[in-house]
Each structure stands twice: as structure tokens, then as C-alpha cells.
Amino acid sequence: MAKKGSGLLVKLVSSEGTGYFYVKKRDPKKLVEKLSFRKYDPVARKHVLFKEEKLR
């Protein structure tokens, strides 16, 4: 079987403060700045900005 990529798992936390988060894999070699996405937060029931944090 093929090896899994050497991607880094990061947590995308809602800026709304609901505690909802997504987990995403990213390539540490390509990206220098932190990720931020506008995604759906089901707790807030709207699209909000999600910012990258370290996954513990």
C-alpha cells in the first residue's frame, strides 16, 4: 500500500466562539501563513470565518 502523505493536521476553529471546529490536512512546506476559511457553523446556523489552530 502507498504511504499516507506527510501532511500536518490542523484544527479550524469558528471565530463565532461556538466551539465548533473542522479538522483539515495541510502541507507545511507550501503554506507559510495560517489557513482561514469561510465555512458553515451549524451551532450558529450561518457561514462564519474559521481560523487555524494547532491540533492537540
From Swiss-Prot:
Domain of life: Bacteria
Record-linked Pfam families: Ribosomal_L33 (PF00471)
GO CC field: cytoplasm; large ribosomal subunit
InterPro entries: Ribosomal_bL33 (IPR001705), Ribosomal_bL33_sf (IPR038584), Ribosomal_zn-bd (IPR011332)
Keywords: Ribonucleoprotein, Ribosomal protein
UniProt cross-references to Gene3D superfamilies, sorted A to Z: Ribosomal protein L33
Record-stated family: Belongs to the bacterial ribosomal protein bL33 family.
UniProt name for this protein: Large ribosomal subunit protein bL33
